[in-house]
Amino acid sequence: MKRIPFIHLMAVTMVWLIAFNVVPALGPRAAEVQTRAEAGQNADAEFQAMLARVDGAQLELQNGRPAAFKALWSRRDDITLSGGFGGTIEKGWEQINRRLDWVGTQFSKGTNTIERVVANASGDLGYVVQIEHLRFHVPGQAAESRRDYRVTMVFRRESEGWRIVHRQADSQMTKQPAQ
């Protein structure tokens, strides 16, 4: 039989007693933990609100209006965009701003359905992985176009609130064998 060190046994017992409120947690450390937990809940609510704004702004973008989506991006030099239309990876606000203006010219009469795979935030960083199903018209064309994207976005909390710092999208929705 494996022997458990006495100090380890005491620590586990205290955690259990506090967790099940048999004995209240004592001292300022308990207050710090509670404050951090409450802050995490607020951050989660703020992050979820940001995701809702992103969803609405993307719909605007898919209708040829990029301003709302652009407003959600950080203006720092370390941001990146690897867009679903292919091409180079854009870096920094100046390049991303131009790219998003161009993307806005590619869409009209758009709708989307977003399947969130996972969304999480911790501290000042957050991320979302999702599948986006887009239906839109290319301006000047009558036929409806369809695109399905696998998307990863990274967010950072800045002085203005949560901001997008990276977006990657691709249309590789089926497994591709090595060739």
Briefly describe each language-model feature range:
Residues 1-7:
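N-terminal secretory signal peptides that target proteins for export/translocation
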Residues 130-137:
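Generic short beta-strand segments
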Residues 20-75, 124, 176-179:
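Short, low-complexity N-terminal intrinsically disordered segments enriched in polar/charged residues
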Residues 44, 48-49, 66-122, 131, ...:
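A solvent-exposed, acidic/Ser-Thr-rich amphipathic alpha-helical stretch
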Residues 139-146, 174-179:
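A short acidic/glycine-rich loop-to-helix N-cap element
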Residues 2, 23-34, 127, 148-175:
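Short beta-strand edge/turn micro-motifs at domain boundaries
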Residues 9-24:
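Bacterial N-terminal signal peptides
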